[in-house]
Amino acid sequence: MRILGSLPNNIRKCTFKLILQKRYSHTDILKELLYDISDSQKFIPSASPIASNLLRVSSYGKLSSLFIEYSKARSKKEFDQLRTSDFQSILRSVVCPKNGKNIRHRDRDLVSLQIKLILQDADRLGIQFNIVDYTHILRVAMYTGNKHILEYIVARVKEKRIRPSVDYFNAILGVIGGNRWSLSKFQSPAFRGSPVTEPVSGKMLDMIEVDFPNYDLVPNSTTYDYLMVGLSRDGKIREIYDLIDTVWGINENSSSKKVDCGNVTFPTHHTVFSIISALGYLGDVSSAVSLSRKLTSVYKINFPELAWRYIIYWSIASLQFRAPAGHARIKNIELFIRLYSQMYRHCVPIIEIYDTSIKFYMKHGRFGLLEKVCESWTKQFLGSLEKQNNEVKKKHLQLLEKQISKLMRYAETERPHDTKRVSVKWSNVLNQIHSSVGDPAKP
């Protein structure tokens, strides 16, 4: 822009016009690539009032509001003049809130019914969806746990002779085997007992070995992420180790780089999350941490801070599982919290990691470990003050004060002999926090 500003007016206008033309041409090419539209049907941005209204309602995040507005427009027969791009926009606005985490049965049914109505209206109006649209439907089905729609979509794609993509097959794998967010909904094979579940990994392997080659498609890292989750659900821990070793060259004894950066199977942060979730679901959290850290070291990937949320969660959940003993598991949790606070002591701490651990230790009466977690949280909070804005500081300060107050009240009821020491120690800590933040200490 500085160079353009130094040019004469007429030259500057011509140059700027050429730049804009070039930019718009790249934008048009990108739209065609993203939406996979045929030559006879160029992408046109949605501008109809009906579609705009539905997209506005969907942005509020309330599925019931979107369903009501869609039903009203449907009853008035306002969809007859809509373009394909309008229907695509409406379809892709139907998403699963929080990726299916703690979703209510009512919302799950609403999502399924909404998709069913959109497909019916599209068929009635002769609108053809592409593979990206069907992939979106399958992803929504994966997050809602709705397997009934899978056979319908697969049959529909075959009937219309639409060429599948890797993302489409990955979405099918996700519907069959679930994803790492849904593992907590299933009873682990490592649980005390012998849960009976329908095997899923066999179907997933058949798809990777048969369907992918039939369409000259190559599995990518996401494919193996879903496969690890499926193997985990079936309790096949040895197969998970073999998969990690075969694809990425990482095992318990040695590690070697097998995949180059340009390869589609090059591991990502999602691979780290999947390894931790798959092995943590089977109770082997220590191996999950070891293998995932080796993977990030060999492939020069930053060990994601979010991974520690999975580690702490599965460390706590695995206390219900079979061997080893629960006492050793609690020591593991303490170790992982210390590792997390040391590795990210200058980063803004993830509140959920400490909050989850504090609730767990309070429930099981582990007061010594409870104090250590609060100490780790305090140190990391004070060490990361420079990187926090005022809003984040205020939020962290309120939550930390709340947990420390709970700790002091807990000591009064459960450890009356230790009340004085706890009160003096943590009152001083609160004063230190307030003075560091710049907020005057409360009397």
Swiss-Prot record:
What is the reported phenotype of gene knockout?
Answer: Impairs growth on galactose, leads to low viability on glucose containing G418, and leads to strongly sensitivity to antimycin A on glucose medium.
Q: Does this UniProt record's set of keywords contain Chloroplast?
A: no
Q: Which GO terms describe its biological process?
A: mitochondrial gene expression
Q: Write the record's keywords in alphabetical order, separated by commas.
A: Mitochondrion, Repeat, Transit peptide
Q: Which GO terms describe its molecular function?
A: mRNA binding
The reply to whether Lipid metabolism figures as a keyword in the UniProt entry is: no
Instruction: One GO cellular component term, please give it.
Output: mitochondrion
> What domain of life?
Eukaryota
Ranges of the PPR repeats in the UniProt entry: 130-164, 220-254
Q: Which compartment or compartments is the protein found in?
A: Mitochondrion
The UniProt entry, under InterPro entries, shows: ATPase_expression_mit (IPR024319), Pentatricopeptide_rpt (IPR002885), TPR-like_helical_dom_sf (IPR011990)
Indicate the residues annotated as transit peptide. Answer: 1-13
Primary location group: mitochondrion
Functional summary from the UniProt entry: Mitochondrial RNA-binding protein required for the stability of the atp9 mRNA.
Protein name, entry field? Pentatricopeptide repeat-containing protein 6, mitochondrial
Please name the source species: Schizosaccharomyces pombe (strain 972 / ATCC 24843) (Fission yeast)
